[in-house]
């Protein structure tokens, strides 16, 4: 991997990318010192680039090629100039400066190959494995930028990622169903006699509500565990965990009776700012 220092405009590019596509994490970086903030924005911009691949291709093969470029870049075998890609250049700088492990970054990219296909998510265990390799890994890597790694931080990050990831699965249901793709576990759909074609058709039902209620409950349990572990990690890690407060707000919204699961409900940026600012001043992110 090339260790040349990328230009400052690469950092600005990453900041703009994260602000546009992952606003809660962008806001969380506002509570971080400049050096760590630059590394966090590089990490989050990498995640944005990986997640966006699904929406940038119409067939799986071009998506696989794009994801493979990132894994090749991380292993030092990228084709073409890495320095010409501002996100890659910034990510390599963050890896160098904070000794970030490459393997979880590569696994994150690999796991998102699932997004390129319309295969059903078979079980809750499979969903948790997917989220652990993506959302939880992102929390773990962000925490590593803020403080030395520890088992306590990894334990918290796993539950944080599962809580946030399940909330995102429910939030993204309208978009995913419109593309005939579901991250709702087939196992849970079957247990509530909820047909996948009904979900694709945008059909509201008590069966689907039962599925979503079960997932919200799972996410709330992970959220409660993550928050209970906050006291066991260094205070310097807390800014990397601030997106948990947005997950908590999302789960509260998603559990409201009578909510239409197929009606997109984008969060207000002002409300997101308020949520994370209040969380930054609260010991348990809950005020």
Which stretches of residues belong to each language-model region?
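Alpha-helical transmembrane segments of multipass membrane proteins
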Residues: 141-145
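Catalytic cores of Mg2+-dependent Asp-rich isoprenoid enzymes
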Residues: 1-92, 101-112, 131-140, 150-166, ...
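Flexible interhelical turns and helix-capping residues at alpha-helix boundaries
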Residues: 120, 146-150
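Cofactor-binding active-site loop characterized by glycine-rich and histidine/acidic residues
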Residues: 98
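Acidic/His metal-coordination segments adjacent to aromatic residues that form catalytic metal sites
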Residues: 113-126, 201-205
């Amino acid at each position: 991997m090339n260790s040349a220092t990328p230009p400052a405009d690469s950092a600005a590019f990453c900041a703009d990318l994260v602000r546009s596509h992952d606003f809660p994490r962008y806001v969380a970086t506002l509570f971080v010192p400049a050096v760590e903030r630059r590394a966090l924005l590089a990490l989050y911009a990498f995640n944005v680039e990986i997640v966006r691949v699904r929406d940038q291709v119409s067939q799986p093969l071009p998506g696989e090629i794009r994801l493979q470029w990132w894994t090749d870049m991380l292993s030092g075998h990228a084709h073409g100039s890495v320095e010409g890609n501002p996100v890659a250049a910034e990510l390599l700088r963050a890896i160098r400066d904070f000794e970030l492990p490459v393997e979880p970054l590569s696994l994150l990219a690999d796991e998102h190959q699932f997004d390129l296909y319309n295969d059903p998510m078979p079980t809750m265990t499979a969903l948790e494995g997917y989220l652990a390799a993506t959302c939880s890994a992102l929390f773990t890597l962000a925490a590593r930028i803020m403080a030395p790694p520890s088992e306590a931080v990894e334990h918290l990050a796993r539950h944080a990622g599962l809580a946030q990831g399940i909330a995102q699965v429910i939030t993204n249901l309208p978009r995913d169903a419109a593309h005939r793709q579901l991250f709702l576990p087939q196992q849970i759909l079957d247990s509530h006699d909820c047909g996948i074609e009904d979900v694709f058709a945008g059909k509201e039902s008590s069966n689907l509500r039962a599925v979503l209620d079960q997932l919200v409950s799972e996410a709330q349990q992970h959220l409660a565990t993550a928050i209970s572990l906050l006291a066991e990690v260094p205070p310097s890690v807390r800014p990397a965990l601030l997106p948990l407060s947005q997950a908590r707000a999302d789960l509260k919204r998603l559990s409201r009776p009578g909510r239409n699961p197929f009606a997109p409900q984008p969060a207000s940026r002002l409300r997101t700012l308020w949520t994370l600012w209040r969380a930054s001043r609260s010991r348990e992110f809950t005020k």
